[in-house]
Amino acid sequence: MKIMNKQSITIFLIICFLINLILSCPNYPEPIKINQNDPTLQKAYKEVDEIIKKGMKDNGIKSFIASIVYRDEIVWSKTYGNVNPLDENSPPLTIDNAIRIASITKTFTDLMMFQLRDKGTISSLDDEVSKYFPEFSIGNLYNTKKSPTFRELSSHQSGLPREVPCDFDDLADWDICSEEVIIERLSKMFLIMPSYQSTHYSNLGIALLGRTLAKAANTEYEKYVKEKILFPLGMMNSSFYYDDVKDYLAQGLILWPNGSYTISPVEELGWSNPMGNLYSTARDMCNYMMFWLNENPEILDSTTLNEAMSPISLLNDGDTVYGTPFEMFYDQANSIWVKSKAGQLSGYRTQMALIRPLKIGMLFSSLLAFQTPDVFTKAASEILIPVYEQLLYEAGSQPQSPFIPDSKLKPTLTTEKYSKEIPNDAFVGTYTNSEGSIFIVDNSTGLLIANFGDDNLFNVSRFSDQYPEILRIKVSNPQDYLCRYVVDGSNYELVYFTITSTPFGGIECNSVTAMGQTMTLASKDPQYLKNNNIEFEKRNKLISKFLQ
């Protein structure tokens, strides 16, 4: 009986731990420079290597390219096999051999869309495609008058059929599969479902998106991507055209049912290029991943980059999400989202996976199309994430704050209101109003900590050197709360103090506005309410209102 009781207690504690893990809101260490030669990290890379080799063996893959980036550098890469997998005398693969990235091309098309929206070339992502491409039409028998929009096309929510209405073997022929032919065929077809009824992956939608964007920008799609995306990112060995890369193209294979292999023919996509015809190298794609993991305002505004990587549609499995056009999955083991895009054409299967909170990116490419849920990136991420988090914390990394630090705030031309820094002591005190609102600032630990008269604590930090009277509050331990509390409550709010000068040249705060409520200083003592047994009958009313 005693043994059973101990077992029951152990099981209960495990269940409590798992519930807390599931219900808590994870936070991640700030990506800082770490020692890439650390034995723990080198062991992790070796395990990734073993995963790839096992996957190659299990799926009959003869040649493979893998690269991992962290922050702004390639930290690990390895190639397996030869440029021609069927010729042992062929040169060994390198990360400078071209591959077909197939549907990863869609991320370039969507990036073009965000650029043109930000420039004002298209006025809104919710503009209907027909506004810029009046020749396009498709039948609609549903109870809606709306035609597909840029946002719907870019995120597979348009209800368009999956494929361009042209035989695959003819796509490269601009006469057989000309724009006029495709548009004429579409005019006799119908939407397969209303927009936003369900995610329906559509190569046609992205091809139409790219061609419509080109019309809006009065240019060719391929020319735009080359000049506005590829070259600015240093992707000089990437192209939409076979002739540009044929001298360094890695050869893809076809594996037949009888176990034999042949070199896959290269069939280009013509009008459908925006959906999947970009050739690139692993080195070039590392530059591309580093763009998504970091910031490059010359390519895309940082706020738009966040928008571009946001979810659009949650699938019924509860942990898979479609974006524009990233396909995202939640790594349950490590409590983190992985933003991914995979592509497959005859002879090639490639996946780009981005773990943006940690600034880790993976580009894995097989010179053989094969059928598995991913290109080994999920297993690799499950190894890399905990190791990186451990090493980051050991290196002194602090938990992330998603707000913009002072170094990234836009300078203003206004004169600062205060000529000297406001000391932390000036903010300390208990602030109240007649409605029962409470805001308490304490620095007894050496750091500014705030609360709204309850047990939920907030770290307090400076907002900007230009506005020293404005502070920011952040939930002290977000991992202890539901994510809903973290995003729905007062987390990351700004609080505005009224500053006055004392007769002896000092500075004091006599009121504060927090969460829209203005409160005056009741006492410089943060324990004022508790020490005086003061209760405000409305004190919890406001608090609960903002936590609902």
Curated annotation (Swiss-Prot):
Main localisation: secreted
Record's keyword terms, sorted: Glycoprotein, Secreted, Signal
Localization (cell): Secreted
InterPro entries hit by this protein: Beta-lactam-related, Beta-lactam/transpept-like, Beta-lactamase-like_AB/R
GO cellular component, one term: extracellular region
Glycosylation sites (chain numbering): N237, N258, N443, N459
Signal peptide (from-to): 1-24
Domain of life: Eukaryota
Family: Belongs to the beta-lactamase family.
Protein name: Beta-lactamase-like protein 2
